[in-house]
C-alpha cells in the first residue's frame, strides 16, 4: 500500500511574489492573492499547513473596480458600544487607506482560524511603487 505524505511546516519553501495592482480589477487581484497566501498554487498543498508564499502588492491606490462597487460596497465595524456601528465605503477606504482595504478583502477569503491569521501576516501592501522588500523579491 502507498501512502501520501503531507508536508510539514518546516519543509515549506516560501517565495516572495510581487504583484502590481495598477489598472487591474480589484476582485481578481484579491482572489489571486488569497490563492497564493494559502499555497493552493503549489503541488504539495496541504490544508492544515501554512504553505503559502509572501505577497507584496504595490500601487494599491491605482486599482480599478469593474462596476460601481466603489460607492455601493461598505465595510462595517463595531466599537462594542450601543449605536456605534461604523461603516466606510470602498471609495473612502481606497482614498484614505488602500492597505486596509486590501487586507479586509483578503481576510474575507482566508480561513477564519489561527492559520488564516498567520497567512494574512504574509501580505504586504503599499500604496506607491516603493517597498522595503526589494532584497527578498527576486526576478519579478
Curated annotation (Swiss-Prot):
CDD domains: Ribosomal_L13
Keywords for this protein: Ribonucleoprotein, Ribosomal protein
Gene3D superfamilies, per the entry: Ribosomal protein L13
GO cellular component: cytosolic large ribosomal subunit
GO terms classed as biological process: negative regulation of translation; translation
Matches recorded under InterPro entries: Ribosomal_uL13, Ribosomal_uL13_bac-type, Ribosomal_uL13_sf
SUPFAM superfamilies for this protein: Ribosomal protein L13
GO molecular function: mRNA binding; structural constituent of ribosome
Family: Belongs to the universal ribosomal protein uL13 family.
Protein purpose: This protein is one of the early assembly proteins of the 50S ribosomal subunit, although it is not seen to bind rRNA by itself. It is important during the early stages of 50S assembly.
Subunit and partners: Part of the 50S ribosomal subunit.
Protein known as: Large ribosomal subunit protein uL13
Organism encoding this protein: Nautilia profundicola (strain ATCC BAA-1463 / DSM 18972 / AmH)
Amino acid at each position: 500500500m502507498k501512502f501520501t505524505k503531507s508536508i510539514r511546516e518546516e519543509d515549506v519553501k516560501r517565495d516572495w511574489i510581487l504583484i502590481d495592482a495598477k489598472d487591474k480589477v480589484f476582485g481578481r487581484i484579491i482572489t489571486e492573492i488569497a490563492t497564493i497566501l494559502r499555497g493552493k498554487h503549489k503541488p504539495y498543498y496541504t490544508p492544515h499547513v501554512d504553505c503559502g508564499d509572501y505577497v507584496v502588492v504595490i500601487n494599491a491606490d491605482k486599482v480599478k473596480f469593474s462596476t460601481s462597487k466603489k460607492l455601493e460596497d461598505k465595510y462595517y465595524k463595531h466599537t462594542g458600544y450601543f449605536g456605534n456601528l461604523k461603516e466606510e465605503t470602498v471609495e473612502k477606504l481606497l482614498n484614505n487607506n488602500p492597505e486596509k482595504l486590501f487586507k479586509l478583502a483578503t481576510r474575507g477569503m482566508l480561513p477564519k482560524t489561527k492559520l488564516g491569521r498567520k497567512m494574512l501576516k504574509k501580505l504586504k501592501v503599499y500604496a506607491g511603487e516603493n517597498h522595503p522588500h526589494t532584497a527578498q523579491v527576486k526576478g519579478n
